[in-house]
Amino acid sequence: MQLMLRLNPKTFIKVGREYVLKFGHLQRVWIFNRLLIMSGDAELNEQLLSSQEHLVKHPVYKVLGQWLGNGLLLSDGKVWHQRRKIITPTFHFSILEQFVEVFDQQSNICVQRLAQKANGNTFDVYRSICAAALDIIAETAMGTKIYAQANESTPYAEAVNECTALLSWRFMSVYLQVELLFTLTHPHLKWRQTQLIRTMQEFTIKVIEKRRQALEDQQSKLMDTADEDVGSKRRMALLDVLLMSTVDGRPLTNDEIREEVDTFMFEGHDTTTSALSFCLHELSRHPEVQAKMLEEIVQVLGTDRSRPVSIRDLGELKYMECVIKESLRMYPPVPIVGRKLQTDFKYTHSVHGDGVIPAGSEIIIGIFGVHRQPETFPNPDEFIPERHENGSRVAPFKMIPFSAGPRNCIGQKFAQLEMKMMLAKIVREYELLPMGQRVECIVNIVLRSETGFQLGMRKRKHN
């Protein structure tokens, strides 16, 4: 209980490190009648995350239930299996190739908007990146522009931002995670949360209905004509895949589709924003890494800003891959993942021997801590992209920024391509300067920084 009283978003990392030094990478904690296992142990993590049996997420995620319903993040059992199977083809190379066009266009807008900030003064880069990530995920998930980067941000984009912040705050408080206690102690915030969720869900449903109608019109036109413009020129979106899918012989309902689209909107903007903001901050503090990265960008993409960047171009940015890997190692966007055991978990261990963790137990895997273990990563608190060069492979389950196993992040390829595009465009255009305060990590649903993501930017002389 003492541990839980000491834990909050700001102290989580510090207290976690103290406990690891004192008790090792495996700890058992009782909170009243709840058994919690805190694991930074690669052997145990591998067995749990690889398991096809222990797939139920930790109950803390239920905070997101009112918004995301039974979407891929929160569902389990048959529903999760069916939805995962439907959504996996969305990340096939040919569809990702189309998504890269969106990354290209929206990152150009981001670069243009950053020009106002690139005056050598300190600013927090988070909002600019967040707006771009929202525009990207809306256009790729829903096939709809929401103009989050435009001056007049849409009510939908604002609702996503405000609701994410509110849910993140609730996530780190044991009593606020209980919907009834939250409602009783903060009725005004419960009302606000409901309003925000209604705004988002009404918008999503409207888009789904419009897209469903367009798809039906398109199919009837295709039967009458072989007009090229009807089909092949239209970019696929996740929504199209969902609209054309069936479960047990029936199409998905609007509500089922909405749950998946909302899940992608939440997971696809917040995590990427965190990853990119931390990466830009580290680049601003490491001019030698930035210079090496710029050299590669110019070599692969050239200096013609009007030339579209393709998925193949992004594949050639090998040093940038090392930079992204190192940033994800130090700052995994999802710093902790958890499971609630529905059945006994039998494990084997080279040090602790074989054993059983009983059904009903909760297991928390601290990805942030796993990535900072000096026995795997010497000088773990230093930003050294070169440690990932020359195909040097880290043992599986010792580097898991996208989690691992059957419930790993389905959009990891998407996220990496988006990060590459944004970083390439920003670093080619602007020098990142080491200004303002350093980041101070806060552990939440998504990793954040207490001090924001402060840096300076200066337009490069055209190279």
From Swiss-Prot:
Q: Where in the cell is it found?
A: Endoplasmic reticulum membrane; Microsome membrane
Cellular component per GO?
endoplasmic reticulum membrane
Its Enzyme Commission number? 1.14.-.-
CDD domains this protein is in?
Answer: CYP4
> Where does it primarily localize?
endoplasmic reticulum
Record carries keyword Protein biosynthesis: no
- Which stretch is the leader sequence? none
Instruction: Spell out the Pfam families in the cross-references.
Output: p450
Q: What cofactor requirement does the entry state?
A: heme
The GO terms describing molecular function are: heme binding; iron ion binding; monooxygenase activity; oxidoreductase activity, acting on paired donors, with incorporation or reduction of molecular oxygen
Functionally, this protein is described as follows: May be involved in the metabolism of insect hormones and in the breakdown of synthetic insecticides.
State if RNA-binding is listed as a keyword.
no
Give the record's family classification: Belongs to the cytochrome P450 family.
> Which residues does heme bind?
E267, C409
Note the topology in the membrane. Peripheral membrane protein
Provide the gene name from the record. Cyp4d8
Please list the coiled coil stretches: none
What is the protein's species of origin?
Drosophila melanogaster (Fruit fly)
**Keywords linked to the UniProt accession:** Endoplasmic reticulum, Heme, Iron, Membrane, Metal-binding, Microsome, Monooxygenase, Oxidoreductase
User: Which enzyme class, named as a word?
Assistant: oxidoreductase
This chain belongs to the protein called Cytochrome P450 4d8
